[in-house]
Amino acid sequence: MKFVLLFGVLLVTLFSYSSAEMLDDFDQADEDELLSLIEKEEARKDCIPKHHECTSNKHGCCRGHLFKYKCQCTTVVTHSGEETERCFCGTPPHHKAAELVVGFGKKIFG
């Protein structure tokens, strides 16, 4: 019985401490969120969207839902027989799998 009482007091103390910390974090998070939204809007204007050409700027792809798109390159043979490299911003297969698992987890656990 003493153990249950001690455990209950410890649990209540931890809960009250974490809720006070969360309130402080929310205040700071509001300010940080506003600044990050402004920065993201500026960065979004300069980034390359999904499925667009990124041959000249391989590190300029935009962010997806969870991950930043990667510049994926392939070698293309032109009508004249020359091989050229063409690149586009896309989601790598392992990122697609991770997004699928996260999406499935969100549906299950809400």
From Swiss-Prot:
Molecular functions (GO terms): toxin activity
Proregion span(s): 21-44
Disulfide bonds: 47-62, 54-71, 61-89, 73-87
Tissue: Expressed by the venom gland.
Subcellular location per the Swiss-Prot or TrEMBL entry: Secreted
Domain of life, per lineage: Eukaryota
UniProt entry tagged with the keyword Disulfide bond: yes
A GO CC annotation given for this chain: extracellular region
Entry's free-text remark on domains: The presence of a 'disulfide through disulfide knot' structurally defines this protein as a knottin.
Protein name stated in the entry: U1-lycotoxin-Ls1ff
